[in-house]
């Protein structure tokens, strides 16, 4: 058997040795008979070597299924097979197959189904690598030479190595080929769990496409729900009653007692932030119809352009759950300290980011990982967890434990209203007995920080204690200083595999200098309006500025002096988070939509000039909705979330152009993408979330691979 020949004819005898009937047959064939020689394909199914795998010709019209005219065969102990016919090959390795690490060993049972492919004319070895080549060819018009050249270059191996039994390679090539085979086999195993071949193909395409990404950049903006900025986006699940592609009709807002509000409540204190040249007062905002309204509608008496900063809106852990109201999303106005402003949205087509979303991809089904405000959503972004505060009830923070009402099973119902809380939101904003930063103790006795607390390391809004000569720590005697955290985060996992990463923050260097100055000022400048609780890694014990200064300096970096220069030089780490400074992050209350839009669009323009751009994925999303209404019901997950829907823009040469991606995501889908791309251990919180979603009748969150193509789109 010639394992390197893709097609072979059955042996031909010398004429002098041929029997008379055969000579007569050949003579008849020469005279026009129907006699024909059947071609066949020989090869091996390898990874190790797979015995008893089913092999067939793959359908040219329905990938990952056998051609209807192809008879399937089973592989021998060495993985070898012979098929009649010609074409692409499909190997189904079921749990009845045997996996041999080396030929001749006893082997072991296969525990997870695998679907492997090989392109037509290149099926001498059917493996995860041949599958990857076949997938690339699906996207490049069937060009094997281009697919082989591209994959070999990415892996740093020879094209001959891709087409060989890599188990017999040696040295660096063996290491690289076996590593890629193992990585892709895991992706194939995951995709092969799909019941429908087309779904399995799509899942595998996305997972392999993610492997093309060498640099992931996350730009984490602030406090905008999806409907608030992208509710009018064509093809997206936008503002109900306004965007024709909205998935639902509008559900009117309810009062605190559940009755339908006749009108929206006023915007308490007026619609504009202090210091704006344009002012919309509380009195001007009364009697708005009970429905979403456009803030930047030039024909409205309440017109506010995107350059004007509106007042802030409450956005806290329990408050967000009360506004969502089990998925009805009908109590945003009732449980907002900004009343009717919570129902406002913008014409996002005026933004530069809108144009970028149209050119690349907009995800319209991403929910914040955790309910509530920026503090918790930043923590969830990096660890898929909530910060802990052990023994809070006997600590200086005991007054920060929230008071909540629960049902008979202990499930959260609402924040306990204060004695003076209005009975209708039309008479005033809601008031609570204690909407503190900490949860009551759970069944294990642990307290969790879910609303803003300060880091124990500088920069922190809490100054150093009077006896701290280093000036590098925050005063732990303050009730809102959180003890250093020790949970595993994504940085730990990346560092554990020697994969570089960094959190770049706007104004980090300057603010750190001010915070640690011997004569620290009582306030910090605005701009930049640096936000201490937007720096999640600074809360973790392994970032101690005295005990781990080198680790800290390596991973907590300054945007202004480092990010763009790193990008320009092609030196961004494989994983880079960027947090814009306060006045450029689009946060209502202290930043305008327009300023943040221009800044982030400018950063993307610079990233596209980077030498790393050709294999870069930029994810622009928002930490939370900022108290603004969104109509999409969050899927039911675990006790931390997911919360309200926010926008996400995916920018990369590998992004499917002009896509509105309806795949279900949450903020921690960023962690999933990083985890899958770099083969990291899975954070406990990711597993907990996905299991909870499935247990509640939903599906796990995606990892953005559905928006990616296997070949560059530009």
Language model segments and positions:
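Generic cytosolic/nucleocytoplasmic N-terminal low-complexity/intrinsically disordered segments
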Residues: 1, 5, 108, 112, ...
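N-terminal pro-sequences and low-complexity stem/linker regions of secreted or lumenal proteins
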Residues: 206-714
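Feature for extracytoplasmic/surface-facing segments of secreted or surface-associated proteins
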Residues: 32-209
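C-terminal motif of bacterial Sec signal peptides marking the signal peptidase cleavage site
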Residues: 27-30
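Bacterial N-terminal signal peptides that target proteins for export
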Residues: 3-21
